Amino acid sequence: MKFIIKLFPEITIKSQSVRLRFIKILTGNIRNVLKHYDETLAVVRHWDNIEVRAKDENQRLAIRDALTRIPGIHHILEVEDVPFTDMHDIFEKALAQYREQLEGKTFCVRVKRRGKHEFSSIEVERYVGGGLNQHIESARVKLTNPDVTVHLEVEDDRLLLIKGRYEGIGGFPIGTQEDVLSLISGGFDSGVSSYMLMRRGCRVHYCFFNLGGAAHEIGVRQVAHYLWNRFGSSHRVRFVAINFEPVVGEILEKVDDGQMGVVLKRMMVRAASKVAERYGVQALVTGEALGQVSSQTLTNLRLIDNVSDTLILRPLISYDKGHIINLARQIGTEDFARTMPEYCGVISKSPTVKAIKAKIEAEEENFDFSILDKVVEEANNVDIREIAQQTQQEVVEVETVSGFGPNDVILDIRSVDEQDDKPLKVEGVDVVSLPFYKLSTKFGDLDQSKTWLLWCERGVMSRLQALYLREQGFANVKVYRP
């Protein structure tokens, strides 16, 4: 099988040296992502496209899906590469490929040509289009807005029959811009802002301020791992978790109620800046949107920025909540965010929307900054790829099984779309579907006399959810890994 990768248009308008660098980085990213599917896979870069060739036909859909999620790719063409002799040969091959697709449909033919030939692109379009129209009685030509567009590419003595076109996410390849540190909470905003910086070519590391205990951190780990695995797995990134409960306790005790929200955000920026400096990261990323909550007025954002020299990027600053939720739905983080607990809002009952710098600084004079230094020093820093391994260690009390007994039921916790695309069928045992994001509210409704074997494709989500359910007091859960 063969795929032709078309570059994001902004890459093609760069200078020659920058364009070549971007293409080289994108080629490396594609190799890093796809090597898990086919070790014999070949990735070849050209001036205006990248070729991907693979032998394992069983991995075709997985490879195609992975390519659509790599930043820097505008669209992917799945092609059949065959030799040809003349225009009539091109027509015959096009007829064999597209006959079934065109029956009862309107169509047009579009040809791109490279190399020296005795015919032009328009001549091929007319010849092939006329031939298809004659040989498929139920089809008819329509040059504007047809049901089907027959795409052909001619390069020297090779014909590329385009079997399908699939849109990528665009943007710049990860690694073409400098690293950033995303302040991730697991909600709608931070997930979308992290994705937007990945799409713009940044390697995004994650910093999580834990205000709600182990269950909250597990949920945020899921979001960070999902974003990395889906859009940024070409690069290694860090997940830094800081236990911020001592800081919150100090704020509740020492800071005036109305100033708590701004002071908390200033403490977070101070801590994140220390982490960024430690790892040589150039900027922080937040999901703040202007006026969304009390701490996100211009006055308060300016006061928050003042505590650090580190650049703070806010890609969602002008977005409304509905737009952000729609983006979260598109990238697949909406369901995570809907079930994520929100802790920041409970810290202040009557927050100020226009904090005064002198008053904020006066309140902070009462704060014991050694507490902040201590929690940063004790921050838990892991390679995001190790989250699965760490989860396996943490869920040591949750048994992992490869078989099943008479009282066991397999619980497929994949998302609804994944279940529809690839239903799980196991002989000799019942399989029940319950997406991971409904476990917290719906697992208790299941028959608790049964033993539930949690299953997902890679085993990461099933381990995380098993730990969560154990913490909630459910002892009848195991992890199923056949």
Swiss-Prot record:
Tell me a Gene Ontology molecular-function term this record carries: ATP binding
Q: Which InterPro entries match?
A: Rhodanese-like_dom, Rhodanese-like_dom_sf, Rossmann-like_a/b/a_fold, ThiI_AANH, ThiI_fer, ThiI_N, THII_Thiazole_biosynth_dom, THUMP_dom
Pathway(s) annotated for this protein in UniProt: Cofactor biosynthesis; thiamine diphosphate biosynthesis
Instruction: Report keywords, A-Z.
Output: ATP-binding, Cytoplasm, Disulfide bond, Nucleotide-binding, Redox-active center, RNA-binding, Thiamine biosynthesis, Transferase, tRNA-binding
Cysteines paired by S-S bonds: 344-456
Q: Which processes are annotated in GO (biological process)?
A: thiamine biosynthetic process; thiamine diphosphate biosynthetic process; thiazole biosynthetic process; tRNA 4-thiouridine biosynthesis
Q: Which reactions is this enzyme annotated as catalysing?
A: [ThiI sulfur-carrier protein]-S-sulfanyl-L-cysteine + a uridine in tRNA + 2 reduced [2Fe-2S]-[ferredoxin] + ATP + H(+) = [ThiI sulfur-carrier protein]-L-cysteine + a 4-thiouridine in tRNA + 2 oxidized [2Fe-2S]-[ferredoxin] + AMP + diphosphate; [ThiS sulfur-carrier protein]-C-terminal Gly-Gly-AMP + S-sulfanyl-L-cysteinyl-[cysteine desulfurase] + AH2 = [ThiS sulfur-carrier protein]-C-terminal-Gly-aminoethanethioate + L-cysteinyl-[cysteine desulfurase] + A + AMP + 2 H(+)
Q: Which residues form the active site?
A: 456
Superkingdom, natural source: Bacteria
Functionally, this protein is described as follows: Catalyzes the ATP-dependent transfer of a sulfur to tRNA to produce 4-thiouridine in position 8 of tRNAs, which functions as a near-UV photosensor. Also catalyzes the transfer of sulfur to the sulfur carrier protein ThiS, forming ThiS-thiocarboxylate. This is a step in the synthesis of thiazole, in the thiamine biosynthesis pathway. The sulfur is donated as persulfide by IscS.
Tell me the protein's name.
tRNA sulfurtransferase
Please name the source species: Salmonella choleraesuis (strain SC-B67)
Organism phylogeny: Bacteria, Pseudomonadati, Pseudomonadota, Gammaproteobacteria, Enterobacterales
Gene name per UniProt: thiI
